[in-house]
Amino acid sequence: MENTPSHINKTEPSLDKTYSPQEIEQPLYEHWEKQGYFKPNGDTSKESYCIMIPPPNVTGSLHMGHAFQQTIMDTLIRYQRMQGKNTLWQAGTDHAGIATQMVVERKIAAEEGKTRHDYGRDAFIDKIWEWKGESGGTITRQMRRLGNSVDWERERFTMDEGLSNAVKEVFVRLHKEDLIYRGKRLVNWDPKLRTAISDLEVENRESKGSMWHLRYPLADGAKTAEGKDYLVVATTRPETVLGDTGVAVNPEDPRYKDLIGKEVILPLVGRRIPILGDEHADMEKGTGCVKITPAHDFNDYEVGKRHALPMINILTFDGDIRSEAEVFDTHGEATDAFSNAIPAQFQGLERFAARKAVVAEFEKLGLLEEVKPHDLTVPYGDRGGVVIEPMLTDQWYVRTAPLAKVAIEAVENGEIQFVPKQYENMYYSWMRDIQDWCISRQLWWGHRIPAWYDEQGNVYVGRDEAEVRRDNNLGAEVALRQDEDVLDTWFSSGLWTFSTLGWPEQTDALKTFHPTSVVVSGFDIIFFWIARMIMLTMHFMKDENGKPQVPFKTVYMTGLIRDDEGQKMSKSKGNVIDPLDMVDGISLEALLEKRTGNMMQPQLAEKIRKRTEKQFPNGIEPHGTDALRFTLAALASTGRDINWDMKRLEGYRNFCNKLWNASRFVLMNTEGQDCGQNGGEMVLSLADRWILAEFNQTIKAYREAMDTYRFDLAAGILYEFTWNQFCDWYLELTKPVMNSGSEAELRGTRHTLIQVLEALLRLAHPIIPYITETIWQRVKNLKGITADTIMLQPFPEYDASQVDEQALSDLEWIKQTIIAVRNIRAEMNIAPGKPLEVMLRGANAQAQRRVLENQSFIQSLARLSSLTLLAEGDKGPVSVTKLVEGAEVLIPMAGLIDKATELDRLAKEVAKLDAEIERIEGKLGNEGFVARAPEAVVAKERERLAACAEAKQKLIEQQATIAAL
């Protein structure tokens, strides 16, 4: 017993009066961690179960998406741990190249007025490590608050020495196999940060722009079918005209097909460029002629490759017009196929100034046909905040096609399963059309590319410079410089499942826990992370027979968490909810400061302030971790986006209270009493037999839900059993026994109370760990359990022998009868405590048996002064009636209600509902409201209308019943 958490008072006879998560959660977590309960049990004869947390950015702090995914992961880990498996849940953080570099750059700019260039590369990187030491642990501290049962001693960081070695090893081996190469290709270029960025870091914004229609004169006296001596091309980026190397028309287009193979003379530069036939030109769109700029547009780049067009780069890395262009062939080699001259008037211009200058020149030459307003999608860098340029640069690439083939087969043959299954199609569509992966970034923070150059520009790849010199016989007199670039962070996180277990060493951890069991991830990174992990892992990890090993057997995909109106949570919308604010509570002032302080766009602050004050007039109450986890589990319908609902959170906080109070009731009736654990005769009441049957059916359904990743169903099953069956019915049904049962009956009921509550706590533990451990520590002694923690107790198993079908059907009938009486009380406005006379008319043999065997139960729970079975043919007095299976329930009304008063009350209630129905119908009939209001608001009004109509119908039926008395 020495391991009982110190804050649990062992001598106190019962639980504290009120459930206070703030007092129990943190001390309990510290106790669990200190005792080492989160570590694998080390029993390699047992099946192992392993989850790797998707590494959050080291710069980050916990948001709702993390809380959601980590609740699911912890629920799975606790569930599997309780089944005796050797479980490892491993956490870590990602070095987050660009994000971390920017955080530290902003910090030194604000505090010291310096840039990273003032520091120099090595000193700046030292500065980042220093920052990581001070601030990098925020997210892991917050993860502990969620109750995450992570083995913290195995925490990893993507720039750890071990992981850095694995990254080098992978790079060197892929390069040896010709699966990594350096090439000149088009990338997303951020001119502000001066680096290539991934598609995930590009934010496409809708904007109003222009479409310029420009005339390109035909060469050699050629004419169009309409007799014109020029083609008109439409473009949204006139500045790129300087880099055009062709004009495409559709080969089927009757207007232009005779011109294919002829040339136009490019205005401003006088370059002769070919007219090509290509499907890329759409006859229906614009003029049907498309200018082709292979060095500055992703589609044009593909067209250029198909037709072997040279590529002309006209921009510097800052996004300005170059003083002379760079001309390359389709392989990225320099060529003199075209002149590299750029007219002097455009040289050095910033790209948007160049746009204006080019348009002005076309107008001056009489070659501007027209300008039309145009809605367009513009790519912005999500961190630099400037327009992204497709840019021709030298980068390192992974040749993905051979890796993708194996990774596709792993999903096709079921080695990896997606939950929900529809995400497999998304995976296939991307993998079957996969492009080579640009893995280099022009940053300082990250894994530096293990490649060196000599003065002639030869490239050598190796694990370090010494290896490069040794393998290539390069003496000390040969000067080498290392590649300045670093690797895309997705490259190192792509090795996450095996590098964190010690690869390339063949460690015991790798043998025990790889492949891992499941990965829980958002669908937005299915390509960036999931697909790349599958490709890289299967290439490097092989089983003892040399067969490629998958990184995980199941991919559980989550949707996004949105606000209550279905909007994406973002700082600029001011609708972000911090999960820890729901756990600990936050005042309105602090919440406003959080939402409006340090805003990138301060002009939005007032709108956000108003919205927040309306939504949270008193701030947010503390709800505790368990209520947050329960809500997240309950909302986790597979793969769909979730609209966050504060009312659900309150409901699950109430659930925790209900469980606490029910446990107090059980303890008050069992502590210090004979609960049958020492033998002695036990008689189980119908209610005892019924709750055991209900509970076993609950275990079965709950396990099925957990085994199929239906956490929403599991949470619903747990809620329904605990609240409705156990608390509302069973605890009430024990009261007649407690008041007047025999010793054997008392023993039976106490024994059942303890048995069901103790197992229910184990059932609920994976979702709500804190409250269940706290209560279990009190209940375990009554069951004679000496173990230290619920975490390592066996998970409840379904026992068919406990399912007494007769008890289930008998008690269901009794419940229906009691509900019938309660409904009549409510409809007739009769006080709940007023004893009633009740009669049963036309009862069949089954109903009669049930009444005779359980009369005291029924009378006690329905608050009856008498319960009479009417003889056959006896109609009984004037009564309000309800049908139950095999009988009719009668409550004589004589002396119970004043008919006139009651009818008057009902008429007033109907009138009130009529007014409300009219108000809502008016609102929904207003087209402006329906069109402008958020979808969720309109849906709420429609639900309210349906509820009012239903309530009105019920009142009308009651009026008819009373009028007939």
UniProtKB/Swiss-Prot annotation:
Class of this enzyme: ligase
Localization per Swiss-Prot or TrEMBL: Cytoplasm
Position of sequence motif 'KMSKS' region: 568-572
Binding-site positions, ATP: K571
EC number: 6.1.1.9
Region entry Disordered, spans: 1-22
Pfam assignment, any one: Val_tRNA-synt_C
GO MF annotation list: aminoacyl-tRNA deacylase activity; ATP binding; valine-tRNA ligase activity
Domain of life: Bacteria
InterPro entries per UniProt: aa-tRNA-synth_I_CS, aa-tRNA-synth_Ia, Anticodon_Ia_Val, M/V/L/I-tRNA-synth_anticd-bd, Rossmann-like_a/b/a_fold, tRNA-bd_arm, tRNAsynth_Ia_anticodon-bd, Val-tRNA_synth_C_sf
Coiled-coil annotated spans: 896-965
Motif, 'HIGH' region: chain positions: 56-66
Gene3D superfamilies xref list: HUPs (3.40.50.620), Isoleucyl-tRNA Synthetase, Domain 1 (1.10.730.10), Valyl-tRNA synthetase, C-terminal domain (1.10.287.380), Valyl/Leucyl/Isoleucyl-tRNA synthetase, editing domain (3.90.740.10)
Record keywords, A-Z: Aminoacyl-tRNA synthetase, ATP-binding, Coiled coil, Cytoplasm, Ligase, Nucleotide-binding, Protein biosynthesis
Main location: cytoplasm
Example GO BP: valyl-tRNA aminoacylation
UniProt KW Cytoplasm keyword: yes
PROSITE patterns per the UniProt record, alphabetical: AA_TRNA_LIGASE_I
GO-annotated cellular components: cytosol
Family (UniProt): Belongs to the class-I aminoacyl-tRNA synthetase family. ValS type 1 subfamily.
HAMAP family, per the entry: Val_tRNA_synth_type1 (MF_02004)
NCBIfam families according to UniProt: PRK05729.1 (NF004349), valS (TIGR00422)
Oligomer and partners: Monomer.
Record protein name field: Valine--tRNA ligase
Source organism: Yersinia pseudotuberculosis serotype I (strain IP32953)
